[in-house]
Amino acid sequence: MAEKTHRTMDDFAQACGVSRPTLSKYFDDPASVKPATRARIEAALRSSDYQPNLFARNLNRKRTRNIGIVVPTITDPFYAEMVSRIEFRCRDEGYWPIVISSHGSPKLEAESVRTLLSLKVAGAIIAPLGLASDRGVFDKLGQDIPIVYFDTYIEGDTPFVGNDNRQSVSTIVDYLCRSGEPPVYLDIPHVNHNSGERQESYIVAMETAGFKPVVIEGTRDYTWDFERIGYEQTEKMLQAGALPGRTILCANDRLAFGVMAAAFSRGLKVGRRPDCDLRVAAHDDHPLSRYTCPALTTMAQDFTAMAGRSVEILLALLDEADPPKQGLARTVKLGATLVMRQSA
């Protein structure tokens, strides 16, 4: 038997024998209507091709059941992993995520924020570009909807969930100093606060351990092309015979990928065994780090906790029936775990 066709919600409500507000209430939360009414609507759905336009319905509300997620890039598996975890958590709580990438561009990031406002999202979880972000755009967003930053932040009082760089960097510096030659530090462009915090934490950790910190300055150009920077910087040092140490601690895993590729191209053996030429370690536990050759020793950020706490804080801010208490955490810094693999 052919399915019945209903073009509008009014048509379908009439076919179900319920009012339009009751039908709308069902689509918001099936458990909110009487069991008999729910059964009638669901029976009608099975015999009809009707699909509610949830997007249009949401736009007619002051606040939707959509959560905006903005990240610098979706091609980086670190952010892809975070988006995936945040997405599933939002779905579990009855919200639909809308994911937008700023592609490393401050202009596109500002455009992404304006798009979220036009879509009337209930709130947003954002990994901003950081130092290049337009603070005014985010201040405007924060006045209109609740937002939470993760991984990095823009100065202000917006809640933030991220890594405790002091703890994580000191942990891996301690390990490298105990297991071999103290590390030199390969820096990245300071695109956000993580870059500066990690460099500063390295210096403090080395001085605390009684060693002289050695920072290899990278390019000061604004770029997120970290693999290329790692490769070119290492190639340049190897070509000049100016590598300042045999243990390199990279500011993040993507930088280390470039370092290891440059070492391989020069015939150098990376690893922690006595016959190896170079040890390489890094930070983040990027999803591909376990698959490099050799597998990369790194500090693993807590993806699950970062995603979970970000959503929890946003939901608390969205809870009109039970507004968040004054004690709601504004800054959550999560510890990282040392993952010892074969590279160092």
Language-model regions, residue ranges each:
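Short, well-structured alpha-helical segments in soluble
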Residues: 107-120, 228-244
